[in-house]
């Protein structure tokens, strides 16, 4: 009987403490800055300016006073480009020469072999005077 009472005294307090903690609700938490309850006027202005820059960047409408995004030069450049492309000798002089197709490098062929078809001699020579097939 004494062992039973001693066992009951040892196990009862932790059980009561665990049951008591689960029954009580947690105290209400004070509102925090991370909840968004506090915003200063400066942070509001920064957020609105950031959003405005993002929208302007997405839409592509920047102010005309912004020197880095001024696109007044594009029209004259396009005209010059069209004139350059219409002058073929100047274009051909500017472009590098390409090797002929039979001397072109191929990743599938070993060095020494060239791209193109190899033509072998006919197995039976044609008689003189008979036409060769094309």
UniProtKB/Swiss-Prot annotation:
Q: Where are the transmembrane segments?
A: none
A Pfam short name:
Hormone_2
Would the keyword ATP-binding turn up in this protein's UniProt record?
no
Per the record, residues carrying Valine amide are 59
Modification type Phosphoserine: residues: 63
Q: Which GO terms describe its cellular component?
A: extracellular space
Which GO molecular-function terms appear in the entry?
A: digestive hormone activity; G protein-coupled receptor binding; hormone activity
Q: Which UniProt keywords apply?
A: Amidation, Cleavage on pair of basic residues, Hormone, Pharmaceutical, Phosphoprotein, Secreted, Signal
Q: Which InterPro entries match?
A: Glucagon_GIP_secretin_VIP, Prosecretin
Which residues belong to the propeptide? 22-31, 63-134
As given in the record, the signal peptide range reads 1-21
GO BP, sorted A to Z:
adenylate cyclase-activating G protein-coupled receptor signaling pathway; diet induced thermogenesis; hippocampus development; intracellular water homeostasis; positive regulation of lipid catabolic process; regulation of appetite; regulation of synaptic plasticity; response to nutrient levels
Instruction: Please state where this protein is localized.
Output: Secreted
Q: What does this protein do?
A: Hormone involved in different processes, such as regulation of the pH of the duodenal content, food intake and water homeostasis. Exerts its biological effects by binding to secretin receptor (SCTR), a G-protein coupled receptor expressed in the basolateral domain of several cells. Acts as a key gastrointestinal hormone by regulating the pH of the duodenal content.
UniProt family annotation: Belongs to the glucagon family.
Listed name of the protein? Secretin
Gene expressing this chain: SCT
């Amino acid at each position: 009987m004494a062992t039973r009472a001693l066992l009951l005294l040892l196990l009862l307090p932790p059980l009561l403490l665990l049951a008591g903690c689960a029954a009580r609700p947690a105290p209400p938490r004070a509102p925090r800055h991370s909840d968004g309850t506090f915003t200063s006027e400066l942070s509001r202005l920064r957020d609105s300016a950031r959003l405005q820059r993002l929208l302007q960047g997405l839409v592509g409408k920047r102010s005309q006073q912004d020197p880095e995004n001024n696109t007044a030069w594009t029209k004259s450049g396009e005209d010059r480009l069209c004139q350059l492309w219409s002058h073929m000798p100047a274009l051909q002089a500017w472009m590098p020469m390409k090797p002929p197709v039979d001397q072109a490098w191929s990743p599938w062929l070993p060095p020494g072999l060239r791209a193109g078809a190899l033509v072998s001699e006919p197995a039976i020579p044609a008689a003189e005077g008979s036409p060769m097939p094309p």
